[in-house]
Amino acid sequence: MKTVIMAGGKGTRISTIAHEIPKPMIPVEGKPVLEHELESLREQGFVDVLITVSHLGDKIMAYFGDGSGISPATGKPFGVHIEYYVEKEPLGNAGALFKIRDKLDEDFLLLNADALFDVDFRRFVAFHETHGGLVTLFTHPNSHPYDSGLIVADERGAVMQWLAKEEAHPRYYHNRVNAGLHILKPEVLDRTGIDPLTVGTLGRNGKPVKVDLDRQIGRASCRERV
């Protein structure tokens, strides 16, 4: 199964302390966060990786290359095969998926590039295949649900609503937060009604059209940048 890692964010919240390196390259225990992710994937047999990059993406590409080289941090092979998609303009947190649609011919893992996790990906994939959803999200409780995006699901685990952290939360809710790990069937991109040729082009306000898929599952938000 291919893994797509989204590494195109600007990391504005940490820019005051790490403005010269992209957030996925911040070192934790001597190596970049993204390297921890790739190690976890490799150890579980997920070695076909496509990374979307934008802001300071050249630093990510220079460090990892195509994945066939040696880690400067560990002195060991990365042991994965890496391709890149470079966003010339920010496309939103899902816009790049429409640009690489031709490379996605089967279900794929979709990960954020700036998270540390200890996850059994094979078990995650097995759950996805058993339940047959277009999208499967990995969720978890956290210590600050009041300012986090929340997943509202029914008793069977089917996602009913995705509440962004900016939106009003119900008074009573389950502490279930999106972990930034997903499995998608590629056809979900075809069901959004978004023309991939418009993503990144200039909209009515003269700014690039961006796409976000972080509001409701199966309902994309296509908007012009403001």
Residue ranges of model-derived segments:
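Hydrophobic packing residues within well-ordered alpha-helices of enzyme cores
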Residues: 14, 60-64, 192
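Conserved N-terminal catalytic core of the sugar/cofactor nucleotidyltransferase
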Residues: 2-5, 27-123
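Short, well-ordered beta-strand micro-motif
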Residues: 27, 139, 152, 183-185
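Catalytic-core segments of class I nucleotidyltransferases/pyrophosphorylases
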Residues: 108-109, 116, 122-129, 142-145, ...
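N-proximal low-complexity "stem/linker" segments adjacent to membrane-targeting elements
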Residues: 1-18, 25
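Short acidic-glycine loop/turn motifs at beta-strand connectors
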Residues: 152-158
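A short, conserved acidic/glycine-rich loop-to-beta-strand motif
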Residues: 131-141
